[in-house]
Regions:
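Short, glycine/polar-rich helix-capping loops at beta-to-alpha or helix-loop-helix junctions
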Residues: 134-143, 364
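Conserved PLP-binding catalytic core of the aspartate aminotransferase-like
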Residues: 296, 301-308, 315-349, 360, ...
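PLP-dependent enzyme catalytic core of the Aspartate aminotransferase-like
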Residues: 60, 64-68, 72, 95, ...
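Conserved N-terminal alpha-helix of the aminotransferase class I/II PLP-enzyme fold
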Residues: 64-111
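Active-site phosphate-binding strand-loop segment of PLP-dependent enzymes
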Residues: 52, 154-210
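Conserved PLP-anchoring active-site segment centered on the Schiff-base-forming lysine
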Residues: 119-138
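Active-site C-terminal subdomain of aminotransferase-like
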Residues: 204-207, 214, 219-325
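N-terminal "arm"/small-domain region of PLP-dependent enzymes with the aminotransferase-like
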Residues: 11-73, 206
Length: 391
């Protein structure tokens, strides 16, 4: 039966968000994810808000691989991994991921959110310490909440090496310290100070975990991620990432680590023990996406070139764009309603850029987030800059 207090609360929230201009629009897309998409009731618009960083979501080889996976294995596994849900294509994908990012082994998940929810409760011991950057992704935060209550959790200010070292010094009596960071921070677009983090973890015998979801396929000459960008392949203990961004854009996530760590995750990680395995069509698509990158690393170079061009173009228009090699360019607005207003203005001009406010970012720090793709042509980039010039 309906609950009147619940109904009243829901209606009040919706009314407040609507009146304050904080309601987020949901656009219905009627075409594949590519630079120009068809929006229901609008027509064709230029997308500058997609995670399709390398333009592989509609790559012919990636699509054909997914179709083959669907034909060969059907719609899904209908089982968790340890019962009858492990397909040979899962093993092929996991071997491909481990080889690509440079670890002993890897395990796939239906999302990187699931991967981070599996990682911390499974591998972190009850007397361990987690040291987490304050701007880490929500999936890391939620994964940490699922750990033993006895685990000590401390948050250090964003990229503050001084505070992190102090925390490492203060927690040396604990069995294992885990330093956890995004490789690329999704709302700031900046890169973790990985060389210094590696040095600190070696100095204090701590484990280093990097969520490279917005870096894999983006950073490094081969698109391997943050560790390749800094020439630190093999120096990160645990890497988590997604298959739903640069690596085909479909879905899925992974943990890449030592063979022992992966075996423990297989045996005890709850997300893969209690939910179906990744569909074969996604495994095939992701495998092919990695092959495309390996066979043609110039696609990564095109992304880097597009990022530099758009970032400079926005700076020339007077927008405050912090220098960064990543494909994420935040434009700070402050007021959430104003950010959403500017997003709608851009949409009316045929360019899709999303305004982000609370709870995705802190109150008072609303922003537009531009996301760049290797698939953008010079004409697309000029169209985008022309629209921003009219704001």
């Amino acid at each position: 039966m309906p609950n009147s207090q619940f109904d009243t609360r829901c209606r009040g929230l919706i009314t407040d968000w609507t009146d304050s201009g904080q309601m987020k629009p949901f656009y219905n897309i009627e075409s594949p994810m590519r630079p120009m998409v068809e929006i229901s009731g609008k027509g064709e618009v230029l997308v500058l808000c997609s995670n399709n960083y390398l333009g592989l979501a509609d790559h012919p080889e990636v699509i054909e691989a997914g179709v083959k996976g669907l034909r060969d294995y059907g719609a899904g596994t209908a089982s968790v991994r340890f019962i009858c849900g492990t397909l040979d294509c899962h093993r092929s994908l996991e071997s491909k991921i481990a080889s690509f990012v440079g670890t002993e082994s890897a395990l796939s998940y239906v999302s990187c959110w699931n991967a981070n929810e599996a990682l911390f409760p499974t591998l972190v011991g009850p007397e361990d310490v987690i040291l987490s950057d304050e701007l880490n992704h929500a999936s890391i935060i939620d994964g940490m909440r699922l750990m033993f209550k006895s685990v000590t959790k401390k948050v250090y200010k964003h990229s503050s090496l001084e505070q992190l070292e102090t925390l490492l010094q203060e927690t040396q009596s604990h069995p294992t310290r885990w330093v956890v960071t995004d490789g690329v921070f999704s709302m700031e677009g900046d890169v973790a100070k990985l060389p210094e983090l590696v040095d600190l973890c070696k100095k204090y015998d701590a484990m280093l975990v990097v969520d490279d979801s917005h870096a894999v396929g983006v950073l490094g000459t081969g698109g391997k991620g943050t560790h390749e960008h800094f020439d630190l392949l093999g120096e990160v203990d645990v890497i988590t990432g997604t298959l739903g961004k640069a690596l085909g854009g479909a879905a899925g996530g992974y943990i890449a680590a030592s063979a022992d760590a992966i075996q423990i995750l297989e045996q005890r990680g709850r997300p893969s023990l209690f939910s179906n395995a990744l569909p074969a069509t996604v495994a095939y698509s992701a495998c092919k996406a990695i092959e495309v990158i390996e066979n043609d690393p110039s696609i990564v170079a095109r992304l880097h070139s597009n990022v530099a061009t758009i970032r400079q173009g926005l700076a020339d228009l007077g927008f405050d764009c912090t220098p960064s090699p990543t494909a994420i360019i935040p434009i700070m607005i402050g007021d959430e309603a104003e950010a959403i207003k500017k997003s709608k203005q851009l949409f009316d001009l045929g360019v899709m850029v999303i305004g982000f406010g609370f709870p995705v970012v802190p109150k008072g720090e609303a922003r537009l987030r531009v996301q760049v793709s290797a698939a953008l042509t010079d004409a697309h980039i000029q169209q985008a800059l022309d629209a921003f010039a009219k704001l």
